[in-house]
Structure formats: structure tokens, C-alpha cells
């Protein structure tokens, strides 16, 4: 396969609690088109437990995936023999679910003698704006989800440099934990956003973690503790208390995020020149308050903000299919020995950040 061909790729996503499959077309000029994109959320299965249960997720993927793939192929109006490749998220994620998706992709590829592409789930998020907006390299990616918070220089397919990451909780994880702490239903992120809209963001003086540091790392554990302490002090909580706590928490996250992104964009410019865009991806990018804050950051940095539609920010099969197509266009395929991975760094050279290392000159 070469970049001069039109490619048709099936993508499978099973890394967490969405069972998804999609068919995407990548044209010779590098543009793309989604032919189908089927996502089945497992929210109902996990809601009684207040979070994702890995074994339940894996079993649900087993039960659902064949039907989801069949529907994706049917809606795309194509058959397996017409596919140029089969892509599956091979990690990072909950290993049981990753095994289900990757094994299914291998079976399809083997039976139909079709190339297999084992996709890094994070790379799929990183490349989505090239599908939705034909974004050119290099660009600065803000990836924020329940499991990841990273600022990444995206220089090309397979070429990523992590500029910043969280030293403790991911942003989406923190939203979910605050929701659970305050007794809000699962999934917690949208519930916190909804409550915050009716709250007083200045009632509580919550900390803004990492503000003013020259690096681009995040930390949310101290903020989470501050919210817990206020909630404990006010117990029993009135509905307005919950709204105000959510509003104060979200405002602190927005201030911290804006500061960290400003540092990340500065680091990007110092190392790689001006980015073609600031791109936001991951489920957290569906939060409208976060989108507004991102627009302000991009405007101050005099760069373009690109945020894919909400359905393509959260986990989906189209992003896996597109990443597979991008890799396939470069001749990058995988053997049947491709292993599922619970952990898989986007930047293979990245190291764990030190929470208080190299924070200020002379510190």
C-alpha cells in the first residue's frame, strides 16, 4: 500500500468501556471520509459500580463486538474483501478489552488476507484532526481523557514528543473522582460540568496547581484534596453546596489548564517553531467550559484551535481506522504476533516527570 492509493480501513476500539467499529476511507490526497462509525457505550453496565469494572468491560466487548463490526460494515456498504486493512487499538488500555479487539482484528485480517495495523490508542486521538480538519504537521496536541493528560508535539505519523503530562491524576479521572465524592451519578465528568453551570465558582478559594512553573506538567491531587476537605467540612451537603464545589473545582482546573498549555505552547515554539494549530482531543474536550478556555488560550497564543466534534473526541472506531489508514499509507503494518499492551507510551523516549524537579531556576 502507498499514499497514492485510496485506502479503505476497518477500525476496532475496545480499550475501555466503548465497543466501537468504523470504516474510513483515506484518499490519495490525504483527505478522509467516515463511511460508518458505530459506538456502543457500556455506561449502563458500569453505572451500578460507579466506575469501569475491567472484567465486566471485557465480557461486554466479547458479547457486543461481532455485531458492532457487522453493523459498521453494513452501513459502510462494503465487504471484508474490499478492505485495504484492518486496524485495532492494541493499547494502552484495559488489557482484557484490548485482547478482545485485537484478536478480532487479527481473525478478520487472517481470513481475508488483509494487512493488520496495531494502533496506539493515543496516536489515534493525536491524528483525528487530520481526518476532521486536514490539519498539517506539526501541531500541538492537548490530550485529556479519563486516563491521560498530555501536551504533545505531533510532528508526523509515528513522530511524537511529549512536552508535558500529569504527575498524578488525569483531568478526566479527577472529574470522575470529584463526582463520586459528591454523590453524583456515573459517568461523573458531564455531571460535574452540569452542576458547575449552576454554581458559584468563587465561593471556595481552591488552589491552582503548578501555576507559573516553566515546565508543562499537570497536578490535580492537591486540588482534589482541597475539594474533599471543603465537602467534609460542609457535610451534610445541600444541592447548592454541590453546585458551588463543582464550579470552584472546574474553575481551578480551567485556570491550571490554561497556564500549563501556555507553557506547553512556549516549549513547542522553542523546540519546533510555531505550531500549525492547537488541537484538543480526548473525552474531556467535550466539556464546553474547557472548550471556551481553550479558545482563549489559542487566541492569546495567536494560533488556530481545532477541536474535533464531540463524538470524535471520545473513544470511537473512526479514529482507530484513520490512524490505521495513515500508517498503512506509509507502508506500516503489523504481523500476527502484535501484542496487546496495557501500557504504551506515545513518545517512546518520554520519562516519568518529577513533581518538584526543575521547577524554577535555583530551586
UniProtKB/Swiss-Prot annotation:
<dbReference type="InterPro" id="IPR000905">
    <property type="entry name" value="Gcp-like_dom"/>
</dbReference>
<dbReference type="GO" id="GO:0005506">
    <property type="term" value="F:iron ion binding"/>
</dbReference>
<keyword id="KW-0408">Iron</keyword>
<feature type="binding site">
    <location>
        <position position="176"/>
    </location>
    <ligand>
        <name>substrate</name>
    </ligand>
</feature>
<comment type="similarity">
    <text>Belongs to the KAE1 / TsaD family.</text>
</comment>
<feature type="binding site">
    <location>
        <begin position="143"/>
        <end position="147"/>
    </location>
    <ligand>
        <name>substrate</name>
    </ligand>
</feature>
<feature type="binding site">
    <location>
        <position position="189"/>
    </location>
    <ligand>
        <name>substrate</name>
    </ligand>
</feature>
<feature type="binding site">
    <location>
        <position position="125"/>
    </location>
    <ligand>
        <name>Fe cation</name>
    </ligand>
</feature>
<dbReference type="InterPro" id="IPR043129">
    <property type="entry name" value="ATPase_NBD"/>
</dbReference>
<dbReference type="GO" id="GO:0061711">
    <property type="term" value="F:N(6)-L-threonylcarbamoyladenine synthase activity"/>
</dbReference>
<keyword id="KW-0808">Transferase</keyword>
<feature type="binding site">
    <location>
        <position position="287"/>
    </location>
    <ligand>
        <name>substrate</name>
    </ligand>
</feature>
<keyword id="KW-0963">Cytoplasm</keyword>
<feature type="binding site">
    <location>
        <position position="121"/>
    </location>
    <ligand>
        <name>Fe cation</name>
    </ligand>
</feature>
<comment type="function">
    <text>Required for the formation of a threonylcarbamoyl group on adenosine at position 37 (t(6)A37) in tRNAs that read codons beginning with adenine. Is involved in the transfer of the threonylcarbamoyl moiety of threonylcarbamoyl-AMP (TC-AMP) to the N6 group of A37, together with TsaE and TsaB. TsaD likely plays a direct catalytic role in this reaction.</text>
</comment>
<feature type="binding site">
    <location>
        <position position="315"/>
    </location>
    <ligand>
        <name>Fe cation</name>
    </ligand>
</feature>
<keyword id="KW-0819">tRNA processing</keyword>
<dbReference type="Pfam" id="PF00814">
    <property type="entry name" value="TsaD"/>
</dbReference>
<dbReference type="InterPro" id="IPR017860">
    <property type="entry name" value="Peptidase_M22_CS"/>
</dbReference>
<dbReference type="GO" id="GO:0002949">
    <property type="term" value="P:tRNA threonylcarbamoyladenosine modification"/>
</dbReference>
<keyword id="KW-0012">Acyltransferase</keyword>
<dbReference type="InterPro" id="IPR017861">
    <property type="entry name" value="KAE1/TsaD"/>
</dbReference>
<dbReference type="GO" id="GO:0005737">
    <property type="term" value="C:cytoplasm"/>
</dbReference>
<protein>
    <recommendedName>
        <fullName>tRNA N6-adenosine threonylcarbamoyltransferase</fullName>
        <ecNumber>2.3.1.234</ecNumber>
    </recommendedName>
</protein>
<keyword id="KW-0479">Metal-binding</keyword>
<dbReference type="InterPro" id="IPR022450">
    <property type="entry name" value="TsaD"/>
</dbReference>
